[in-house]
Amino acid sequence: MKIIEAVNIRYTYPDGTEALKGIDFHAKKGEVVALLGPNGAGKSTLFLHFNGILQPTSGKVLVDGKEIDYSKSGLIKVRQKVGIVFQNPDDQLFAPRVDEDVAFGPLNMGLDEDEVEERVKDALRKVGMSGYEDRPPHHLSGGEKKRVAIAGILAMKPDIMILDEPTSGLDPRGASQILRLLHELNEEGMTIIISTHDVDLAPLYSDRIYIISGGEIISEGTPGDVFSDIDTIRGADLRLPRIAHLVEILQKEDDLPFGEPYPLTIGEARRKLRDQLK
């Protein structure tokens, strides 16, 4: 079942810039979907359509099979189902204390204080930030801020979480913690949609991948399908995952017969190497 869908959406900014050019996109319930593209391709603009922050110039966005209602009450309902975590957590965190920031969404849903308190406690526990309730967000590290921003969305209990460049600006440990958290949330049934230009990350965590370039979707499919079209990947100013690129070089320049498609992860490469050595 398609839990969220964009149908032929176009978007033109007030200055006349056409940012999206007939985008078709969907995610099924329980999927992890990656939107892969270079900077300026339209990833963030597309995401802002998914909970009604932006309204398409033409086309439509559907959540649970229903077109978004852009009235105030309609948007409140959509944002209870679809949560967006911005690339820069400083754009999202504004309250003087962590617990107040996480409580903002549930309070605006009209929940009573006991329910809000329970949701804040549970969300901070899930992201590993229990004990930080009274800390000022601006005193936190980049990874901690990102986790608090995710907690603020979790506290609203959405069905879909959308994250714009979730590992941007994080060191390897911080990035790993965020990705592990997203995997756990997906295991609990949440649909996860991420944007990234990190081609090494996408095959590890995604069920399906979309490639966006110049405001258009130019490829869609499983990681294996998408990365097997090398010309399209490089034509979008992206590259192969490091493992796949290494295998490409070994096969073309050193005559090692790996075959195609190229492995995309260390695990896949290890299995292919073991097969070669048998």
From Swiss-Prot:
One Gene Ontology term from the biological process aspect of the record: cobalt ion transport
Record domain ABC transporter: where: 4-239
Task performed by this protein: Probably part of an ABC transporter complex. Responsible for energy coupling to the transport system.
EC number(s) recorded for this UniProt protein: 7.-.-.-
Binding site for ATP: G37, P38, N39, G40, A41, G42, K43, S44
Location within or outside the cell: Cell membrane
SUPFAM superfamilies for the chain: P-loop containing nucleoside triphosphate hydrolases
The UniProt record lists the keyword Transport: yes
GO MF, one example: ATP binding
Family: Belongs to the ABC transporter superfamily.
Protein name, UniProt field: Putative ABC transporter ATP-binding protein MTBMA_c05830
Membrane topology term: Peripheral membrane protein
Record's GO cellular component terms: ATP-binding cassette (ABC) transporter complex
